[in-house]
Amino acid sequence: MNNDLWLPEEDFKGLPDNFLDNLVDPTNDVSVEDIETGDDEGDWDAKFQKLVPPPLDELMSLSYEFTCNGQRVQVQKHVPILKQSSSSEVFSTVDNSPPNVKVSKLLQSLSPVSVLKNTNGSGSPQNPNGDQKLAFLVKGIRSKRKRPTLLRVTFLKSFLLEMSQQFAPDESESSEISALKKRKKNKSRRLKCTHCETTTTPQWREGPNGRKTLCNACGIRFRSGRLVLEYRPAASPTFIPTVHSNLHKKIIYMRMKDNDQFDTRKIRAETSGPETRSRLRNFGRPMSYGQ
């Protein structure tokens, strides 16, 4: 074996010595004299340009035959290779096969059709539909809604901070508002009805002393003209059952009773004096004239 051959010697183990002699048949050699030369080189170039190369599908569909030791070996069509196999993989498969199969695999890997297939498979983009379907099934259904990116989140945070700072009240304004609220609370606590001295009422009404000076019950009585001293709501802290009442009829009855007691007391006071007693003693005696 010559050193110019780039094929390793291990691939030719088990092959006869005249294997390469049979491949290179001297009877098929063409001499240089048989080649016609002429001035019509331009015509040949024009003719070759008009030729259309055969499609790759037809070349791939053809089967190839060659002779080895007087036997005809046919190379069958193989599956298209997606990835270009390295020389180490090819030679490893050749070592583990019989001699005839070794030759077929070797020539198949070195044939121009296999080179075209490898270049076609490596250069052309593969159809990733199957891989995409598998990945889709594995990963699961994903929504079409766009995921918020980091830039959006940071922009929203900065925007919200600016808006909150713009609409947030200043410290002076907040202190003034708190002071007004405290004053209102203090005023509501200090309010007291001038008639019954109550501090809890659903609504403050106008009285003789101005606005919000009477409670709700006393204010209604004042507007109707029936607010008297004896009237007190039952919830008033100054309510006395023997003196006050929240019913107008009872107040009138109490006044009539007080008037009657006042008249009897006045009569008793007048009759209990010394002059009235002397008059009652002398009443019915005959009077003497000319004494």
From Swiss-Prot:
Name any one GO molecular function: sequence-specific DNA binding
SMART domains to which the protein is assigned, alphabetical = ZnF_GATA
Q: Give one Pfam family, short name only.
A: GATA
ZnF start-end (GATA-type): 187-241
Assigned keywords, A-Z: Activator, DNA-binding, Metal-binding, Nucleus, Transcription, Transcription regulation, Zinc, Zinc-finger
**Where does this one sit in the cell?**
Nucleus
- State a GO cellular component annotated for this protein: nucleus
* Region ranges (Disordered): 271-291
InterPro entries linked to this entry? GATA_TF, Znf_GATA, Znf_NHR/GATA
Which Gene3D superfamilies does the record cross-reference, listed alphabetically? Erythroid Transcription Factor GATA-1, subunit A
| PANTHER family named among the record's database cross-references | GATA TRANSCRIPTION FACTOR, GATA TRANSCRIPTION FACTOR 10-RELATED
Family assignment?
A: Belongs to the type IV zinc-finger family. Class A subfamily.
Q: What does this protein do?
A: Transcriptional activator that specifically binds 5'-GATA-3' or 5'-GAT-3' motifs within gene promoters. May be involved in the regulation of some light-responsive genes.
Q: What is this protein called?
A: Putative GATA transcription factor 13
